[in-house]
């Protein structure tokens, strides 16, 4: 008898799918729903050091930008120097990475919902400009770490991240043999290394000279437009399927 209910079940599934596809329509000039983010982007004249490029329009506050520059900040109690002192050139990339995460209002096309205690959203597969990834890896490959994924698996018993039992401190190059291994694996695929270069308008720059404007605005617009086109095509196809299922349901009810 279950088969008799199939048209109704399929109709409900399609409606739910279509509605979920329309849930998040704001892809431009948005902030993630996360631990330290503002609800809406806006000017922050006193953003600190590496976060200063976002001062005209930021999702972070000045105090957040100050705190994230510390070796062990109170934002997440994360210690960059968990395997000895990280090279300054290497740490600079991690601070810029954190500034991008906390401050950028241009990551909307890649925001995904997550079920985590400290945030409800994250970004996934942000197309990072290939030079940014290459320089990050080159400046860090002689620094040391004990893990290839920094999102999980730490020993937090002291309140600060420490290497888990049995994890050996080795060079970054040992844990991340290629630039892509670092940029894509470090934060569980928050980034995806792009084939595009800085200034192309097709990849996100981790850092930029604000005097020249924010190049990531153009990148976000491009990918948001592409996503809207794809969503429109999907909804157009779904509309035909819904009509067919509605007719099937009507015949089923009459029968």
From Swiss-Prot:
Source organism superkingdom: Eukaryota
Post-translational modification: N-glycosylated.
GO terms under cellular component: cell surface; external side of plasma membrane; extracellular region; plasma membrane
Sugar attachment sites: 115, 195
UniProt cross-references to InterPro entries, sorted A to Z: Folate_rcpt, Folate_rcpt-like
Membrane topology: Lipid-anchor; GPI-anchor
Name of the protein in question: Folate receptor beta
């Amino acid at each position: 008898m279950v088969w008799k209910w199939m048209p109704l079940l399929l109709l409900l599934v399609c409606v739910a799918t279509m509605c979920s596809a329309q849930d998040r329509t704001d892809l431009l000039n948005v902030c993630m729903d996360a631990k330290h983010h503002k609800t809406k982007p806006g000017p922050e004249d006193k953003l600190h050091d590496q976060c200063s490029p976002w001062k005209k329009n930021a999702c972070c506050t000045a105090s957040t930008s100050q705190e994230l520059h510390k070796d062990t900040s109170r934002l997440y109690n994360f210690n960059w120097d968990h395997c000895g002192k990280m090279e300054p050139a290497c740490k600079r990339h991690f601070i810029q990475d954190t500034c991008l995460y906390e401050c950028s209002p241009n990551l909307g096309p890649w925001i995904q919902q997550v079920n985590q205690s400290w945030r409800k959203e994250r970004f996934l597969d942000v197309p990072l400009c290939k030079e940014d990834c290459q320089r990050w890896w080159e400046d860090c490959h002689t620094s040391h770490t004990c893990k290839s994924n920094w999102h999980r698996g730490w020993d937090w018993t002291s309140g600060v991240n420490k290497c888990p039992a049995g994890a050996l401190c080795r060079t970054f190059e040992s844990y991340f043999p290629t630039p892509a291994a670092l940029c894509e694996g470090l934060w569980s695929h928050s980034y995806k290394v792009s084939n595009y270069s800085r200034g192309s308008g097709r990849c996100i720059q981790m850092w930029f000279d604000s005097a020249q404007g924010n190049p990531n605005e153009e990148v976000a617009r491009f990918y948001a437009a592409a996503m809207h086109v794809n969503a429109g095509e999907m909804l157009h196809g779904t509309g035909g399927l819904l009509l067919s299922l509605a007719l099937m349901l009507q015949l089923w009810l009459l029968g």
